[in-house]
Amino acid sequence: MNLISRTLTRAVSSSLYHSKAAKLPTQKWIISQQIRVFSATVISGGGKKPLAKVSVKPPLNVATEKESTPPKKIEYKPEISNWINLIGFVEQPVQFGPCSDGKFWAGTVISQRSGSKSSNFWIPIIFEGDLAKIAVQHVKKEDRIHVSGKLFIDSPPPNVTYSQSNVQVMVQNLNFVQAATSTTKTISPPEKEVTSIKKKPARSKKVKVIDEETSNSWKHLIENPKEWLDHRGNKANGLVKPGHPDFKMKVGGLSLWLSTAPDWALLKLEELKFDVLVPKGNIKLNQLKGEESWKDLVQNPDKWLDNRSDKTNVKYPDFKHKETGEALWMTNSPIWVLSKLPPLKKNQERPFMSNKVSQLELDVEVPKGNLKQLKREEIWKNLVENPSKWWDNRLDKRNPKGPDFKHKETGEALWIGDSPTWALSKLPPLKKNQERPVMA
């Protein structure tokens, strides 16, 4: 604040400190009148005459007059001490900048203009916080404004030798004065920044405030789009949180949100191309990437292994890329791909390249130790196709652990609990009183 205060001091020094004669207009000062009673000595004709007595009227006896009502006493309130209201014209462009404490300050000078320029009285005013941002954006030279706030004293800069200290106003409320007969348009900062004597000040319409630092950042983004990452699409698709920055600088991590963008920057954004970084480890990210993988599976089936028919573990992937090892599961497949998947291929001990046919076919990878499972699939297929060659024990099992089906010639046993899903709907109807050996 001192920096801006000193600058304003230099700006108004011609009228406050060093005018042409290094004097302030006499009408600006109230000098108490001194009444002196003296005796005059008149010397004439070589002789002395007695001192002339000057008649002095006695002061009025105030007590003899009717006593007036004394001023009322009010409660002392620190927030209204040194409070002042001023209306004047802006004489200098608003100066703006940050201070060492992290806050933003702005300042200018106002004057109550009169017919004679020599009698203009300039008063420095200071804005703090959000009100400073509003002032630098909206207040222009020659504007007529109303300000209210507290008076404070700032010592003159070192290069000024005048002994008078500089009186300034720390503005708390700012209004534009449109006309003498019209109402004023009020601009107020957020409530947390305003110290007001009103308990509940009226809220004004929010003004989009853009400080110099933010404006410079948007300028850098427009001029160097390849140095920034665009997260607008990620936010729209829910890949990042709603409060995530819309743009983030690759080096340094500087963040920008569209809500702080100047109008001129918004108009140029659509013309630029940015790099897009899709977050890692996100479910929706995997879905987006999976769309491309499923498309590759349908278009290049010979590059994928089909494990659907011989999975020993439900967590094992249904498809696996031969070169990259990328895995796909049917539970995550898009709806459009279901109708384009190939029929199951089985009984392939080693992966081999399928012949090009009109129907989509995939190679099948048979994991080690899974040949027995493939063989059991064939046995269930034999049961479905040749039910007369099997004993059906489902209705008359004497031992719950006994097989549900048993081959009449080979003695091969099958249990419903181990049957493939596809076989359940194709099993033969229940049979009774079959002539067969007694089952254990």
Curated annotation (Swiss-Prot):
Tissue-wise expression: Expressed primarily in the female gametophyte and in the floral abscission zone.
Main location group: mitochondrion
SUPFAM superfamilies registered for this protein in UniProt: Nucleic acid-binding proteins (SSF50249)
BP term (GO), one: DNA replication
Any one GO cellular component localisation term in the record: chloroplast
Alphabetically ordered keywords of this record: Chloroplast, DNA-binding, Mitochondrion, Plastid, Repeat, Transit peptide
Compartments where found: Mitochondrion; Plastid, Chloroplast
Entry protein name: Protein OSB3, chloroplastic/mitochondrial
Organism of this sequence: Arabidopsis thaliana (Mouse-ear cress)
Encoding gene (name): OSB3
